[in-house]
Amino acid sequence: MSESVPPTHTFTQIDDADLTGLNTLGLPARAQRLARPTTLDALSQVLAERNPAEPLFVIGEGSNLVICSDLPGLTLSLAIDGMSLVKQDNTHVWVAAGAGVHWDDLVAWTVEQGWQGLENLSLIPGTVGAAPFQNIGAYGVELSQLLEQVTVMDVVTAQVTHFAGNECEFAYRDSRFKSRDRGRYIITGIELRLNKMPQCNVSYGPLKARFGHLSQADILPAAVREHVIAVRQSKLPAPDVLANAGSFFKNPVVTKERGDALKRRFADLVAYTQPDGVKLAAGWLIEQAGWKGKRLGPVGMHSEQALVLVNHGNATSADVIALAEAVCADVQEKFGVALEQEPVLLP
């Protein structure tokens, strides 16, 4: 279903905008023009006044980006706000949120209402709009399991379209919006279906250790959220304290045969059986390759979580890319496994 949004509302635009504070790696960059539309009407107007031939970038809070140079053309940072209960039945609630909502604010609000589903995704940085783009996930839960629909705007026609969750082509840290339709749509909001009665997923690592002895009825979303936050804060640096883009590499998935072969060579290999093979813990691979806590110039892999690439100060995108390539090369040499970076490179 599509609908046109009339371009009637104004928007604020900044020329030659500094993006250093708008990417959590703290990389120096500027945008030729930066706009922050707060409504669908404002976004429609931004697109109507844009030259279709000029580059267009959407950056959210910049928590999953490596900005490699100044961005030409138009850069958007959506500020479409709002969280609401759409409908409910005896067992579920449907909630909506605008693309500009801080992701953890949405998680906190739903958990406060007693609704279950998002608690494992607590404290993931970024905005709601970025969540379906890369199908965020943590501790055994992915957004795709909870998402009912994504609302988008076509960058050319300004038409608003709603994609059902099963139309989004979700995969591990991927979606149609990140792959084949990248650049065609701007995500403006999402709708989720959550449980009224707790059915918390505590099958993953530290959650199983904390809650595994309890019955499902005794595991509350608020308690799971609290523990997830504690675990993340103990392992992951806050971007405002130590600049980073979260997990820098995806956990590679290999065939069962390859996983078994690695397990025979490395008895303490951290791996998880998947329908399509075996998922390896990239952080473990990086640590075993000698990169945990190791620096290369102003950047390095974090001392508590080897999966996180950090900027110790004054780093450039070239520094980041050089470190990522060095880590990948060493993991490939030691394990024969190729790592794939998670953040998007711009431009």
UniProtKB/Swiss-Prot annotation:
Its EC number is 1.3.1.98. Disulfide bonds: none annotated. It is found in: Cytoplasm. Keywords: Cell cycle, Cell division, Cell shape, Cell wall biogenesis/degradation, Cytoplasm, FAD, Flavoprotein, NADP, Oxidoreductase, Peptidoglycan synthesis. Its cofactor is FAD. It is an enzyme of class 1 (oxidoreductase). It catalyses: UDP-N-acetyl-alpha-D-muramate + NADP(+) = UDP-N-acetyl-3-O-(1-carboxyvinyl)-alpha-D-glucosamine + NADPH + H(+). GO terms for cellular component: cytosol. InterPro entries: FAD-bd_PCMH, FAD-bd_PCMH-like_sf, FAD-bd_PCMH_sub1, FAD-bd_PCMH_sub2, MurB, MurB_C, MurB_C_sf, Oxid_FAD_bind_N. Residues 27-197 form the FAD-binding PCMH-type domain. The keyword Cytoplasm applies. GO terms for biological process: cell division; cell wall organization; peptidoglycan biosynthetic process; regulation of cell shape. Gene3D superfamilies: 3.30.465.10, UDP-N-acetylenolpyruvoylglucosamine reductase, C-terminal domain, Uridine Diphospho-n-acetylenolpyruvylglucosamine Reductase, domain 2. NCBIfam families: murB (TIGR00179), PRK00046.1 (NF000755), PRK13903.1 (NF010478). This is UDP-N-acetylenolpyruvoylglucosamine reductase. The gene is murB.
